[in-house]
Amino acid sequence: MRMTTSFTGSRGVRYPAPDVARGFMLLLIAVANVPSWNKMPNGAEPPVSSVDGWWMFVRTLVVDHRAYPLFAMLFGFGLMTMINRRIASGTQTYLASLPGAAEGREPMPHEAAWAREMATIDAYRLVRRRGWWMLLIGFVHGLVFPGDIIGAYGLVAVLLANLLARKNYSALYLTGGIISVLALATYLASGTLSGGSTLTASGEQSVSLTVALLWVVTNALQWAVVLVVQVLIALIVPAAVIGARLADTDLLTHPERHHRLLISVGLGGLVLGALAAFHGALTLATTVQLWPWDFAMTEFFGLAGACGWLALLALYAGGPRPDGRLTGLRRLASAVGRRSMTVYLSQTILFGIIFGVVPLLVTGRRLWMGQAAAALVALGVWLACVVLCLLLERGGHAGPFETLLRTAVARSERRRPTPPPPPAVWPGMQPGMPPVAQPGVQPEAPVQPGMPPAPQPGPQPAP
Protein backbone atom coordinates (compact mmCIF):
# COMPACT_ATOMS: atom_id res chain seq x y z
CA MET A 1 0.00 0.00 0.00
CA ARG A 2 1.42 3.38 -0.96
CA MET A 3 1.76 5.68 1.98
CA THR A 4 2.74 8.98 0.38
CA THR A 5 0.01 9.22 -2.23
CA SER A 6 -3.12 11.18 -1.52
CA PHE A 7 -6.54 9.56 -1.48
CA THR A 8 -7.43 11.19 -4.77
CA GLY A 9 -4.93 9.99 -7.27
CA SER A 10 -5.14 13.09 -9.44
CA ARG A 11 -3.38 15.10 -6.74
CA GLY A 12 -0.11 13.28 -7.30
CA VAL A 13 2.62 12.54 -4.78
CA ARG A 14 2.00 13.51 -1.18
CA TYR A 15 5.33 14.05 0.55
CA PRO A 16 5.72 12.35 3.94
CA ALA A 17 7.23 15.14 6.07
CA PRO A 18 4.09 17.30 6.50
CA ASP A 19 1.93 14.26 7.31
CA VAL A 20 4.43 12.80 9.78
CA ALA A 21 4.73 16.21 11.44
CA ARG A 22 0.94 16.48 11.70
CA GLY A 23 0.74 13.05 13.28
CA PHE A 24 3.21 13.85 16.06
CA MET A 25 1.75 17.34 16.40
CA LEU A 26 -1.61 15.80 17.33
CA LEU A 27 0.08 14.03 20.23
CA LEU A 28 1.39 17.41 21.42
CA ILE A 29 -2.09 18.89 21.04
CA ALA A 30 -3.64 16.07 23.08
CA VAL A 31 -1.10 16.70 25.84
CA ALA A 32 -1.69 20.47 25.67
CA ASN A 33 -5.51 20.15 25.66
CA VAL A 34 -6.05 17.59 28.40
CA PRO A 35 -5.67 20.16 31.24
CA SER A 36 -8.73 21.95 29.84
CA TRP A 37 -10.76 18.82 30.57
CA ASN A 38 -9.02 17.81 33.80
CA LYS A 39 -10.85 20.18 36.15
CA MET A 40 -11.86 19.70 39.76
CA PRO A 41 -15.67 19.37 40.15
CA ASN A 42 -16.06 22.30 42.55
CA GLY A 43 -13.79 24.68 40.65
CA ALA A 44 -11.20 24.75 43.44
CA GLU A 45 -7.49 24.97 42.81
CA PRO A 46 -6.23 21.41 42.28
CA PRO A 47 -3.42 20.14 44.50
CA VAL A 48 -0.11 19.78 42.67
CA SER A 49 2.30 17.02 43.64
CA SER A 50 6.02 17.27 42.98
CA VAL A 51 5.63 14.88 40.05
CA ASP A 52 2.85 17.05 38.61
CA GLY A 53 4.90 20.20 39.13
CA TRP A 54 7.96 18.90 37.30
CA TRP A 55 5.80 17.46 34.52
CA MET A 56 4.20 20.89 34.03
CA PHE A 57 7.71 22.36 33.99
CA VAL A 58 8.68 20.08 31.09
CA ARG A 59 5.35 20.61 29.33
CA THR A 60 5.75 24.38 29.49
CA LEU A 61 9.24 24.18 27.99
CA VAL A 62 8.44 22.02 24.96
CA VAL A 63 4.66 21.61 24.49
CA ASP A 64 2.55 24.52 25.71
CA HIS A 65 2.22 27.32 23.13
CA ARG A 66 4.20 25.23 20.65
CA ALA A 67 1.61 22.72 19.43
CA TYR A 68 -0.87 25.25 18.02
CA PRO A 69 1.69 27.39 16.15
CA LEU A 70 2.99 24.13 14.68
CA PHE A 71 -0.57 23.24 13.69
CA ALA A 72 -0.97 26.70 12.11
CA MET A 73 2.24 26.38 10.09
CA LEU A 74 1.15 23.02 8.72
CA PHE A 75 -2.28 24.48 7.96
CA GLY A 76 -0.71 27.32 5.98
CA PHE A 77 1.53 24.83 4.19
CA GLY A 78 -1.50 22.74 3.27
CA LEU A 79 -3.45 25.73 1.99
CA MET A 80 -0.64 26.93 -0.26
CA THR A 81 -0.02 23.40 -1.54
CA MET A 82 -3.70 23.14 -2.44
CA ILE A 83 -3.54 26.55 -4.14
CA ASN A 84 -0.47 25.61 -6.17
CA ARG A 85 -2.03 22.38 -7.37
CA ARG A 86 -5.34 24.04 -8.20
CA ILE A 87 -3.64 26.80 -10.20
CA ALA A 88 -1.45 24.31 -12.08
CA SER A 89 -4.31 21.98 -13.01
CA GLY A 90 -6.78 24.81 -13.65
CA THR A 91 -4.39 26.62 -15.97
CA GLN A 92 -4.02 23.51 -18.11
CA THR A 93 -7.79 23.02 -18.18
CA TYR A 94 -8.43 26.58 -19.35
CA LEU A 95 -5.70 26.36 -21.97
CA ALA A 96 -7.19 23.12 -23.28
CA SER A 97 -10.52 24.91 -23.80
CA LEU A 98 -9.03 27.46 -26.23
CA PRO A 99 -9.92 27.22 -29.93
CA GLY A 100 -7.38 25.13 -31.77
CA ALA A 101 -5.82 23.70 -28.61
CA ALA A 102 -6.94 20.19 -29.55
CA GLU A 103 -5.12 20.55 -32.88
CA GLY A 104 -1.88 21.47 -31.10
CA ARG A 105 -2.01 25.26 -31.43
CA GLU A 106 0.32 26.90 -28.92
CA PRO A 107 -1.38 29.44 -26.65
CA MET A 108 -0.46 33.06 -27.09
CA PRO A 109 1.04 34.94 -24.10
CA HIS A 110 -2.19 36.81 -23.37
CA GLU A 111 -4.11 33.52 -23.46
CA ALA A 112 -1.68 31.89 -21.03
CA ALA A 113 -2.02 34.89 -18.71
CA TRP A 114 -5.82 34.67 -18.95
CA ALA A 115 -5.78 30.95 -18.14
CA ARG A 116 -3.60 31.47 -15.08
CA GLU A 117 -5.76 34.36 -13.86
CA MET A 118 -8.91 32.24 -14.16
CA ALA A 119 -7.20 29.39 -12.31
CA THR A 120 -6.04 31.79 -9.59
CA ILE A 121 -9.59 33.03 -9.10
CA ASP A 122 -10.78 29.43 -8.83
CA ALA A 123 -8.12 28.71 -6.20
CA TYR A 124 -9.13 31.80 -4.23
CA ARG A 125 -12.77 30.71 -4.26
CA LEU A 126 -11.80 27.19 -3.24
CA VAL A 127 -9.87 28.45 -0.20
CA ARG A 128 -12.73 30.71 0.82
CA ARG A 129 -15.30 27.91 0.56
CA ARG A 130 -13.07 25.64 2.58
CA GLY A 131 -12.62 28.37 5.17
CA TRP A 132 -16.36 28.97 5.57
CA TRP A 133 -17.02 25.26 6.05
CA MET A 134 -14.19 25.01 8.58
CA LEU A 135 -15.68 27.96 10.44
CA LEU A 136 -19.00 26.11 10.65
CA ILE A 137 -17.35 22.89 11.81
CA GLY A 138 -15.38 24.87 14.36
CA PHE A 139 -18.58 26.45 15.70
CA VAL A 140 -20.21 23.05 16.20
CA HIS A 141 -17.05 21.76 17.86
CA GLY A 142 -16.90 24.89 20.00
CA LEU A 143 -20.26 24.04 21.56
CA VAL A 144 -18.44 21.22 23.32
CA PHE A 145 -14.89 22.59 23.48
CA PRO A 146 -14.62 26.40 23.26
CA GLY A 147 -10.85 26.16 22.84
CA ASP A 148 -11.49 24.87 19.30
CA ILE A 149 -8.90 25.83 16.69
CA ILE A 150 -10.64 24.72 13.48
CA GLY A 151 -12.88 27.79 13.41
CA ALA A 152 -9.89 30.12 13.78
CA TYR A 153 -8.10 28.44 10.89
CA GLY A 154 -11.25 28.69 8.81
CA LEU A 155 -11.51 32.42 9.50
CA VAL A 156 -7.84 32.87 8.58
CA ALA A 157 -8.48 31.07 5.29
CA VAL A 158 -11.46 33.31 4.52
CA LEU A 159 -9.61 36.53 5.32
CA LEU A 160 -6.32 35.69 3.60
CA ALA A 161 -7.62 33.68 0.63
CA ASN A 162 -6.96 36.38 -1.96
CA LEU A 163 -3.47 37.22 -0.67
CA LEU A 164 -2.54 33.54 -0.54
CA ALA A 165 -3.90 32.72 -3.99
CA ARG A 166 -2.02 35.65 -5.54
CA LYS A 167 1.08 34.97 -3.42
CA ASN A 168 1.14 38.55 -2.20
CA TYR A 169 3.82 37.82 0.38
CA SER A 170 4.56 41.48 1.04
CA ALA A 171 1.03 41.99 2.34
CA LEU A 172 1.11 38.64 4.16
CA TYR A 173 4.38 39.50 5.91
CA LEU A 174 3.01 42.91 6.87
CA THR A 175 -0.17 41.36 8.26
CA GLY A 176 1.77 38.78 10.22
CA GLY A 177 4.16 41.41 11.54
CA ILE A 178 1.38 43.72 12.72
CA ILE A 179 -0.39 40.87 14.51
CA SER A 180 2.89 39.76 16.11
CA VAL A 181 3.52 43.24 17.51
CA LEU A 182 -0.08 43.52 18.70
CA ALA A 183 0.13 40.09 20.32
CA LEU A 184 3.37 40.88 22.12
CA ALA A 185 2.00 44.19 23.39
CA THR A 186 -1.15 42.46 24.62
CA TYR A 187 0.79 39.73 26.41
CA LEU A 188 3.05 42.23 28.11
CA ALA A 189 0.11 44.40 29.15
CA SER A 190 -2.10 41.64 30.49
CA GLY A 191 0.40 39.05 31.68
CA THR A 192 -2.09 36.32 30.98
CA LEU A 193 -4.37 35.22 28.17
CA SER A 194 -6.99 32.49 28.35
CA GLY A 195 -6.90 29.96 25.48
CA GLY A 196 -10.40 28.70 26.20
CA SER A 197 -11.41 25.87 28.48
CA THR A 198 -14.39 23.72 29.13
CA LEU A 199 -16.98 25.06 31.52
CA THR A 200 -17.22 23.63 35.00
CA ALA A 201 -20.09 24.77 37.19
CA SER A 202 -19.41 25.50 40.83
CA GLY A 203 -20.57 23.00 43.41
CA GLU A 204 -21.83 19.53 42.65
CA GLN A 205 -22.66 19.02 38.99
CA SER A 206 -25.73 17.11 37.96
CA VAL A 207 -26.85 15.76 34.64
CA SER A 208 -29.88 17.91 33.87
CA LEU A 209 -31.25 19.59 30.79
CA THR A 210 -30.87 23.05 32.32
CA VAL A 211 -27.21 22.55 33.15
CA ALA A 212 -26.54 21.04 29.72
CA LEU A 213 -28.19 23.96 27.90
CA LEU A 214 -26.34 26.52 30.03
CA TRP A 215 -23.09 24.69 29.33
CA VAL A 216 -23.67 24.73 25.56
CA VAL A 217 -24.68 28.41 25.45
CA THR A 218 -21.73 29.45 27.59
CA ASN A 219 -19.36 27.43 25.42
CA ALA A 220 -20.74 29.10 22.29
CA LEU A 221 -20.09 32.55 23.74
CA GLN A 222 -16.61 31.56 24.87
CA TRP A 223 -15.86 30.11 21.44
CA ALA A 224 -16.77 33.41 19.76
CA VAL A 225 -14.46 35.35 22.07
CA VAL A 226 -11.62 32.85 21.72
CA LEU A 227 -12.05 32.92 17.92
CA VAL A 228 -11.37 36.66 17.78
CA VAL A 229 -8.49 36.39 20.24
CA GLN A 230 -6.86 33.57 18.30
CA VAL A 231 -6.97 35.42 14.99
CA LEU A 232 -6.17 38.96 16.11
CA ILE A 233 -3.85 38.68 19.11
CA ALA A 234 -2.37 35.20 18.87
CA LEU A 235 0.34 33.94 16.55
CA ILE A 236 -1.88 31.84 14.27
CA VAL A 237 -1.67 34.24 11.33
CA PRO A 238 2.14 34.69 11.48
CA ALA A 239 2.58 30.93 11.79
CA ALA A 240 0.22 30.26 8.87
CA VAL A 241 2.12 32.77 6.72
CA ILE A 242 5.39 30.98 7.52
CA GLY A 243 3.81 27.67 6.56
CA ALA A 244 2.46 29.07 3.31
CA ARG A 245 5.89 30.38 2.38
CA LEU A 246 7.43 26.98 3.14
CA ALA A 247 5.10 25.44 0.56
CA ASP A 248 6.94 27.39 -2.15
CA THR A 249 10.26 25.85 -1.08
CA ASP A 250 11.44 22.25 -0.85
CA LEU A 251 12.34 22.39 2.85
CA LEU A 252 9.43 20.09 3.75
CA THR A 253 9.05 18.19 0.50
CA HIS A 254 12.75 17.32 0.30
CA PRO A 255 14.20 17.79 3.79
CA GLU A 256 17.03 15.39 2.94
CA ARG A 257 18.52 18.23 0.87
CA HIS A 258 18.73 20.62 3.84
CA HIS A 259 20.13 18.62 6.75
CA ARG A 260 22.40 21.33 8.13
CA LEU A 261 19.79 24.09 7.96
CA LEU A 262 17.01 21.99 9.48
CA ILE A 263 19.21 20.74 12.30
CA SER A 264 20.20 24.33 13.10
CA VAL A 265 16.60 25.56 13.03
CA GLY A 266 15.37 22.52 14.96
CA LEU A 267 17.82 22.69 17.83
CA GLY A 268 18.00 26.48 17.84
CA GLY A 269 14.23 26.91 17.83
CA LEU A 270 13.58 24.43 20.63
CA VAL A 271 16.40 25.84 22.78
CA LEU A 272 15.30 29.45 22.22
CA GLY A 273 11.70 28.61 23.05
CA ALA A 274 12.72 26.67 26.16
CA LEU A 275 15.00 29.45 27.41
CA ALA A 276 12.24 32.03 26.95
CA ALA A 277 9.79 29.86 28.92
CA PHE A 278 12.27 28.66 31.54
CA HIS A 279 11.51 31.10 34.34
CA GLY A 280 7.76 30.81 33.91
CA ALA A 281 8.03 27.02 33.88
CA LEU A 282 10.17 27.08 37.00
CA THR A 283 7.36 28.74 38.95
CA LEU A 284 5.24 25.62 38.40
CA ALA A 285 7.70 23.28 40.10
CA THR A 286 9.38 25.51 42.70
CA THR A 287 8.62 28.47 44.94
CA VAL A 288 10.05 30.94 42.42
CA GLN A 289 7.71 33.89 41.91
CA LEU A 290 6.24 34.66 38.49
CA TRP A 291 7.60 37.64 36.55
CA PRO A 292 5.10 39.94 34.77
CA TRP A 293 6.62 39.17 31.37
CA ASP A 294 6.86 35.38 31.80
CA PHE A 295 3.66 34.66 29.90
CA ALA A 296 4.65 36.98 27.05
CA MET A 297 8.00 35.25 26.71
CA THR A 298 6.46 31.78 26.76
CA GLU A 299 3.76 32.62 24.25
CA PHE A 300 5.74 34.78 21.83
CA PHE A 301 8.77 32.52 21.61
CA GLY A 302 6.52 29.50 21.37
CA LEU A 303 6.60 30.16 17.62
CA ALA A 304 10.36 29.56 17.68
CA GLY A 305 9.77 26.29 19.48
CA ALA A 306 7.15 25.32 16.90
CA CYS A 307 9.65 26.00 14.10
CA GLY A 308 12.13 23.79 15.91
CA TRP A 309 9.63 20.95 16.17
CA LEU A 310 8.73 21.24 12.49
CA ALA A 311 12.36 21.21 11.37
CA LEU A 312 13.26 18.12 13.41
CA LEU A 313 10.09 16.25 12.44
CA ALA A 314 10.72 17.00 8.77
CA LEU A 315 14.23 15.63 9.12
CA TYR A 316 12.90 12.52 10.83
CA ALA A 317 10.29 11.94 8.11
CA GLY A 318 12.73 12.48 5.26
CA GLY A 319 11.90 12.82 1.59
CA PRO A 320 9.73 10.63 -0.63
CA ARG A 321 10.75 6.98 -0.92
CA PRO A 322 11.30 5.33 -4.32
CA ASP A 323 8.56 2.78 -3.57
CA GLY A 324 6.32 5.30 -1.83
CA ARG A 325 6.23 3.31 1.43
CA LEU A 326 6.74 4.34 5.03
CA THR A 327 7.49 2.02 7.93
CA GLY A 328 7.54 2.05 11.71
CA LEU A 329 6.62 5.22 13.57
CA ARG A 330 6.67 7.20 10.33
CA ARG A 331 3.88 5.01 8.99
CA LEU A 332 1.80 5.49 12.15
CA ALA A 333 2.34 9.25 12.25
CA SER A 334 1.59 9.64 8.54
CA ALA A 335 -1.68 7.72 8.87
CA VAL A 336 -2.69 10.06 11.70
CA GLY A 337 -1.45 13.20 9.96
CA ARG A 338 -3.49 12.58 6.82
CA ARG A 339 -6.61 12.43 8.98
CA SER A 340 -5.75 15.34 11.25
CA MET A 341 -9.25 16.82 11.50
CA THR A 342 -10.78 13.45 12.33
CA VAL A 343 -8.14 12.82 15.01
CA TYR A 344 -8.45 16.32 16.47
CA LEU A 345 -12.23 16.02 16.81
CA SER A 346 -11.96 12.43 18.04
CA GLN A 347 -9.72 13.64 20.86
CA THR A 348 -12.50 15.94 22.03
CA ILE A 349 -15.01 13.10 21.90
CA LEU A 350 -12.78 10.77 23.90
CA PHE A 351 -11.78 13.43 26.44
CA GLY A 352 -15.43 14.34 26.90
CA ILE A 353 -16.37 10.71 27.51
CA ILE A 354 -13.47 10.07 29.92
CA PHE A 355 -13.63 13.25 31.98
CA GLY A 356 -17.29 14.21 31.63
CA VAL A 357 -19.96 11.87 30.34
CA VAL A 358 -19.08 8.62 32.10
CA PRO A 359 -18.16 10.14 35.50
CA LEU A 360 -21.26 12.36 35.50
CA LEU A 361 -23.52 9.42 34.70
CA VAL A 362 -21.90 7.15 37.27
CA THR A 363 -21.02 9.49 40.16
CA GLY A 364 -22.67 12.79 39.25
CA ARG A 365 -19.28 14.52 39.28
CA ARG A 366 -16.54 15.19 36.77
CA LEU A 367 -13.36 13.15 36.85
CA TRP A 368 -10.18 14.81 38.07
CA MET A 369 -6.64 13.45 38.37
CA GLY A 370 -3.08 14.73 38.65
CA GLN A 371 -1.51 16.52 35.70
CA ALA A 372 1.06 13.78 35.08
CA ALA A 373 -1.65 11.12 35.08
CA ALA A 374 -3.76 13.25 32.74
CA ALA A 375 -0.83 13.36 30.32
CA LEU A 376 -0.85 9.56 30.26
CA VAL A 377 -4.56 9.70 29.44
CA ALA A 378 -3.73 12.06 26.56
CA LEU A 379 -1.16 9.57 25.30
CA GLY A 380 -3.74 6.79 25.49
CA VAL A 381 -6.27 8.89 23.57
CA TRP A 382 -3.70 9.58 20.85
CA LEU A 383 -2.84 5.87 20.61
CA ALA A 384 -6.54 5.04 20.27
CA CYS A 385 -6.71 7.51 17.38
CA VAL A 386 -3.65 5.84 15.85
CA VAL A 387 -5.49 2.50 15.86
CA LEU A 388 -8.52 4.14 14.23
CA CYS A 389 -6.36 5.67 11.51
CA LEU A 390 -4.57 2.39 10.82
CA LEU A 391 -7.92 0.66 10.36
CA LEU A 392 -9.00 3.38 7.93
CA GLU A 393 -5.63 3.11 6.19
CA ARG A 394 -6.00 -0.62 5.75
CA GLY A 395 -9.37 -0.09 4.10
CA GLY A 396 -8.04 2.74 1.93
CA HIS A 397 -10.41 5.29 3.47
CA ALA A 398 -9.87 8.93 4.30
CA GLY A 399 -10.96 10.24 7.68
CA PRO A 400 -14.74 10.75 7.93
CA PHE A 401 -14.43 14.45 8.76
CA GLU A 402 -11.95 14.99 5.91
CA THR A 403 -14.46 13.34 3.59
CA LEU A 404 -17.25 15.51 5.00
CA LEU A 405 -15.26 18.70 4.49
CA ARG A 406 -14.13 17.75 1.00
CA THR A 407 -17.68 16.84 -0.05
CA ALA A 408 -19.15 20.03 1.41
CA VAL A 409 -16.55 22.19 -0.33
CA ALA A 410 -17.09 20.46 -3.68
CA ARG A 411 -20.89 20.53 -3.58
CA SER A 412 -21.08 24.16 -2.50
CA GLU A 413 -19.21 25.34 -5.59
CA ARG A 414 -21.35 27.60 -7.77
CA ARG A 415 -21.05 27.26 -11.50
CA ARG A 416 -20.10 30.57 -13.07
CA PRO A 417 -19.79 31.42 -16.77
CA THR A 418 -16.18 31.58 -17.88
CA PRO A 419 -15.30 34.90 -19.54
CA PRO A 420 -13.59 34.54 -22.93
CA PRO A 421 -9.90 35.33 -23.24
CA PRO A 422 -9.12 38.94 -24.19
CA PRO A 423 -8.49 39.69 -27.88
CA ALA A 424 -4.94 39.35 -29.09
CA VAL A 425 -2.69 42.40 -29.28
CA TRP A 426 -0.10 41.87 -32.02
CA PRO A 427 3.23 43.69 -32.23
CA GLY A 428 2.88 46.94 -34.13
CA MET A 429 -0.91 47.08 -33.77
CA GLN A 430 -2.21 50.60 -33.17
CA PRO A 431 -5.25 51.39 -31.02
CA GLY A 432 -8.41 51.27 -33.13
CA MET A 433 -6.94 48.93 -35.77
CA PRO A 434 -8.90 45.77 -36.52
CA PRO A 435 -7.37 42.57 -35.11
CA VAL A 436 -4.92 40.79 -37.36
CA ALA A 437 -5.96 37.34 -38.40
CA GLN A 438 -4.10 34.40 -36.93
CA PRO A 439 -2.49 31.97 -39.35
CA GLY A 440 -5.05 29.60 -40.81
CA VAL A 441 -8.01 31.59 -39.47
CA GLN A 442 -10.26 33.49 -41.88
CA PRO A 443 -10.93 36.98 -40.49
CA GLU A 444 -14.46 38.30 -40.47
CA ALA A 445 -15.15 41.36 -42.64
CA PRO A 446 -16.33 44.35 -40.64
CA VAL A 447 -20.01 45.21 -41.10
CA GLN A 448 -20.80 48.88 -41.73
CA PRO A 449 -24.07 50.37 -40.47
CA GLY A 450 -26.83 50.01 -43.08
CA MET A 451 -24.97 47.44 -45.20
CA PRO A 452 -25.95 43.81 -45.53
CA PRO A 453 -23.54 41.27 -44.10
CA ALA A 454 -20.85 39.91 -46.41
CA PRO A 455 -21.71 36.62 -48.12
CA GLN A 456 -20.27 33.55 -46.48
CA PRO A 457 -18.06 31.11 -48.38
CA GLY A 458 -19.84 28.10 -49.82
CA PRO A 459 -22.26 27.19 -52.64
CA GLN A 460 -24.14 30.17 -54.01
CA PRO A 461 -27.72 29.97 -55.34
CA ALA A 462 -28.10 29.91 -59.14
CA PRO A 463 -29.17 33.24 -60.73
Question: What would you call each of these model-derived segments?
Answer:
Residues 424-428, 432-440, 444-446, 450-462:
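Intrinsically disordered, low-complexity tandem-repeat regions
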Residues 2-426, 437, 461-463:
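Alpha-helical transmembrane segments and their immediate juxtamembrane cytosolic regions
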